[in-house]
Amino acid sequence: MSKVEQYITSIPDYPKAGIIFRDITSVLKDADGLRLAVDEMTEKIGDTEFDAIVGLESRGFLFGMPMAYNLHKAFIPVRKSGKLPRATSRIAYDLEYGSAEIEVHREDITPGMRVVIVDDLIATGGTLEAAVHLVEQLGAKVVKIVCLLELKGLHGRDRLTSCPTEAVVSYEGKEGTTAH
């Protein structure tokens, strides 16, 4: 068991009966918890050679930025569509009830670049899968995905077969488990 797990607050029956909400804000509010989360996520990168960390809006920023800083690597934000001011590349993807788009500054990701994608959560894998495709469209290679939490019962990892995927804390639950 990761030491980070003690800082995650589990709230039963929220937002509705049968769901266990995994609240990571309790990790962020505690200096020791935050340090552990960033350190353990960084350890998951191991000896992987890479050029930049790509963080997904918004909680991927919370962990990706300090990881990039500690490793002296670039940080590249992937945002919801319409949030970046320079020329972007974007990709649409399906959600459970609709669709969404994410984008990145086109010039920030260059052909041949090797990146690690960081987010807070592997759930269904849809956003992470879209981010992998977005990076690959620009000629870069995703060499690893690192997240704080994984909800194994939602099988998101099954969509992320093109590169190694790591999570610090995994919950076995199927539906009825969520995280924010």
Question: Which residues make up each language-model segment?
Answer:
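Short Gly/Thr/Asp-enriched flexible loops that form oxyanion-binding sites at enzyme active sites
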Residues: 62-71, 130-132
